[in-house]
């Protein structure tokens, strides 16, 4: 511990100070970094309470060395947690200063003025009561708390608190005090370093003072008193700062949750848009087969009519090639009588072979009929011009056939029904005598 007050070294419990009633482990915990060393001095021996004797692992100095104890003990320790991030100890025993303040203290051995005032306020002393260097004897904190039982044997300085003299109306110093009293202090500032030891029962309100000059001389007199309010407590400020820090952390967590929820919402919106597009594609694909089924009967009807036309041409060709006398009345069909196409017409069969004596004359006719049938079976739209077939009489047989066929135009894209006229057929056959 830098001084006997356990104020500066900040290690160990409340019993590590002079007269704190520390245990065997607490007596040496403040020296160094927590381990025993050859230069560690037993604090219990300095207070005349060490009962370990030769078994003590700390050094028991001679009385001549007591005057130089301040060289190694009268030091202030800075709080490194406060310098790094934040100190969470409400009753921190170390000095809350910056790294530059600590470096300046190690070089010069003196605290900056603002830190001296802060440390003195924590101890209930004036800044002048603090030791100015490492050569001075440390202050006895047990005496400041009223617990020092050593009396005149105590090797540390006994300083009186300022509020004791202020309550008595005296402004001087006493009891070994080497400084002046700060004006305007009515009561002791709350010692944040002694919170577990003192509690809240030791505080006494300041004296009341009658306020004069507020009432007229002839009127009723009312006595009013002015109460002095205590300055803000260090502990309360620390609690408020901790609460603010917790609230800030909570706000940061809520902000993170909001950002996560926004990202999840964007992903869900994208998935919803994808599902809507998939539904549209499924609807279009289900409509396409229905259109194909609607167009199928039309194609079948056209094919049926093509077969009917082919059958008509085949019938005409077979009738024209029969060598029998036929009158013109039998060959003329009623005008405007439509020929009903067969529903399930079989593909046209090949025409029967002509007689041997008509083969040279019938060959051009068969080729023309085959070409006409091929044109009738072509895919729609189909347009057929009137076909006129004439057979010149080479032999004694003369065959003349004219078959005017009206133009037929079929389109399955406009209407499923196909209407076509069939004109009258005329055929003149002259039979030659043998």
From Swiss-Prot:
Cellular component aspect of the GO annotation: nucleus
Main location: nucleus
InterPro entries: Znf_CCCH
Keyword Zinc-finger on entry: yes
Alphabetically ordered keywords of this record: Coiled coil, Metal-binding, Methylation, Nucleus, Repeat, RNA-binding, Zinc, Zinc-finger
Gene3D superfamilies from the UniProt entry: 3.30.1370.210
Residue stretches of biased makeup (Gly residues): 12-35
Alphabetized GO MF terms: miRNA binding; RNA binding; zinc ion binding
Organism domain of life: Eukaryota
Record region (Disordered): 1-37, 196-217, 314-362
Coiled-coil region(s): 234-280
Zinc finger (C3H1-type) in chain: 36-63, 73-99, 134-161
Function: Specific regulator of miRNA biogenesis. Binds, via the C3H1-type zinc finger domains, to the binding motif 5'-GCAGCGC-3' on microRNA pri-MIR143 and negatively regulates the processing to mature microRNA.
Name of the protein this chain belongs to: Zinc finger CCCH domain-containing protein 10
Organism lineage: Eukaryota, Metazoa, Chordata, Craniata, Vertebrata
Gene: ZC3H10
